[in-house]
Amino acid sequence: ALLSNPPPNRIAAFILRLVLVLGVVLAGARGTAAYSMLTHEEIVDLAWADRIEPLLKHRFPHATEQDINEAHAYAYGGCVIQDLGYYPFGSKDFSNLLHYVRSGDFVEALLRDADDLDSYAFALGALAHYISDVEGHPSVNRAVALSYPKLQRKYGKEVTYDEDHRAHIRTEFGFDVVQVAKGRFTSDDYHNFIGFQVSKPVLERAFRETYGLQLDDVLKNPDLAIGTYRRSVSKIIPEMTRVALVTKHAELVQENPDFDQRKFLYRLSRTEYERQWGTQYQKPGWRTRFLAFVVQTLPKVGPLKSADITLPTPETEELYIHSVNKTVDVFREKLAQLRGKSGRIDLANRDCDTGHPTKPSEYKLADATYAKLVEQLAGNKFQLVTPELQANIMAFYGSDRHSPPADMSAEEWRKVQTAVGGLRGLHPGE
């Protein structure tokens, strides 16, 4: 039977979870990263033992093992922080800034401003995300093109997130589902034992320094946004993964005859944590089966199209695995540099959707994000603008640029030019 007479309090809790799951699905239609959440966590895990943990102990020699375990939770929280704005109660303006404007400078600010073990681990997680996007997105863009021949005919061998949001979401989530299916990800119990934490103070400082805005200028309720993000990362997205494994059961069985159901089910459960992590997953109960029923029944129209994942082919999975290997290699190199004499690294400001250097007309979303930022700064009378931010914006809007970018009206362009003119005459720091 689909349901087995669960008690009313469990039904109420399930209804709340269902609302949150659908909320994340609908919010997911607004944006995504090069990888889905589980892959971002796995990047941290793949570098943890031989790079991140030794770096933390080197920088904070008095940290205990318990301190290091707690720092791991902040690394997990940091590795998806650039996507905070895409979750319910977030703001796409926040995530657009972190992906398209001074993407490298923001991570450098986190690393520079981190003043304790937890905030530094959080910054390292954000570094992992930056590298994952810059190194991973070109491969994912090619995988989307291969998975959707019509899009390939329209856009070419690479299909960017801006060119088709839903195709990216479905492709990236499909990579995660298959990796869970093959038992390649770190145990769900381990993720949940470690937890997910956000270092709000360092996030606020780095955001203000990088963008000349307060965090609550773009996140109307930062605490609610962060709390929902943590809930989504630790509970709701694993629930969605588990539902996807149920709904795609037949296709996964067909692809892998040795399929073992227990290893396909992903769920975080604090109450059932065991010291031996293994790959044991809870069997689908009435909640999972009902969620799967809802997902299968709802018409895949509008934002709900994103709920219908695209499973990778051998060719696209190879692209994914290659990109993960490259990401981890680059991440380890940067971590080794951080342990060097200067303790600093230089990160280029790249468009996190394409991996290319950020420049005018390179990417429509970058153009739109710069325009909105400079207008917002003008609205605040440029109060928090630093010389570095001013120089970055002035470089983006070079003096020889007189025509508006694609898809921007002449009226909107005039507003941008007025704001840029006000910024040009500013002398921050004097």
Whereabouts are the PLM-identified features?
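Catalytic glutamate of the conserved HExxH
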Residues: A126, Y130-V134
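N-terminal, motif-rich segments that launch catalysis or mediate targeting to/interaction with membranes
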Residues: G31-A121, V134-D217, V246-E251, D260-E430
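N-terminal secretory signal peptides that target proteins for export/translocation
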Residues: A1-A13
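Bacterial N-terminal signal peptides
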Residues: I15-A27
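Short, surface-exposed recognition loops or helix-turn segments adjacent to catalytic cores
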Residues: D216-L224
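Eukaryote-specific, cytoplasm-facing alpha-helical/coiled-coil scaffolding segments in long proteins
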Residues: I226-I236
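Mature extracellular/secreted ectodomains of secretory-pathway proteins
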Residues: A128, T241-R242, N256-P257
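A short structural micro-motif
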Residues: Y130, D223-G227
